[in-house]
From Swiss-Prot:
Top-level EC class: hydrolase
GO MF, one example: DNA binding
Subunit-structure text: Interacts with PCNA. Three molecules of RAD27 bind to one PCNA trimer with each molecule binding to one PCNA monomer. PCNA stimulates the nuclease activity without altering cleavage specificity.
Name of the protein in question: Flap endonuclease 1
Amino acid sequence: MGIKGLNAIISEHVPSAIRKSDIKSFFGRKVAIDASMSLYQFLIAVRQQDGGQLTNEAGETTSHLMGMFYRTLRMIDNGIKPCYVFDGKPPDLKSHELTKRSSRRVETEKKLAEATTELEKMKQERRLVKVSKEHNEEAQKLLGLMGIPYIIAPTEAEAQCAELAKKGKVYAAASEDMDTLCYRTPFLLRHLTFSETKKEPIHEIDTELVLRGLDLTIEQFVDLCIMLGCDYCESIRGVGPVTALKLIKTHGSIEKIVEFIESGESNNTKWKIPEDWPYKQARMLFLDPEVIDGNEINLKWSPPKEKELIEYLCDDKKFSEERVKSGISRLKKGLKSGIQGRLDGFFQVVPKTKEQLAAAAKRAQENKKLNKNKNKVTKGRR
């Protein structure tokens, strides 16, 4: 689900933190991609002309494999080295959100049964799309045969993507979920796995610029995201994005906001704090997520296993052999040329903390004063 209204807040208050670029701008970059989110996109977007999912002669869905194969090739063609990260076991705190999703599925199934037009049927069918265990396993098999590394995260894929970026294993995390910023990835790439026909630029969000622009610590930013609405718990009823930002900037933490509301000082009877609100547990899931230490992960891109890849996609899944062989040639060529990398890829760029930035600003101010005094002394001697 991500964070409700966060993109709008960043766009309004810190537009400089979002850079829109063509895919070619990321030549030589390694990127950790939220695989579960990508598969969901492929199942929705990769369709037949009649709007139905792609299937082979046996009736098996192949939209996810078609999307994974060709979108990965597009990245490789443009010199990007992708690594995919799959979701592990969801945190217990997410169970309420998963229950809500199940309830919505039941409601959607009812609407589908009542639909009278093809357009309405298609709309409801897309809402029922769900990434299954089989979809994940088939995608992992495909990536293994393509020579593309993948990781199964202990819990949330976005958290593991951010960990790889923080440890310098990749340049950025790629996901449509804005909650990836809560894990303090240096950079978040959105729309990376979109179809080329959409002509949608890639949005690169700089987390440190977001924090500085909003004048928030990472802890306050996470509290803001919980206030806006995340997958782990409810938010304060009656508080919208504008008010949530104002409350965090005024009071500094959810604890202080709760005190402010419960004391009656807010004079707002519409604000309702959820009972037994687990915001502290939600906060820790963002600030200290369960991940595999990025330093222990060695990402390796290997030549594709041509024979096995053709057997899997063409013999088993009934893909066009001519197109698959063409794709394999692109894959081999792209992985070879992508080895060149970028000059800045030889250096690990460590994002500065707020404290480091403040210290640097103080030093700059002191140097300015020192130079000013030197100029005064020089003028006096004249």
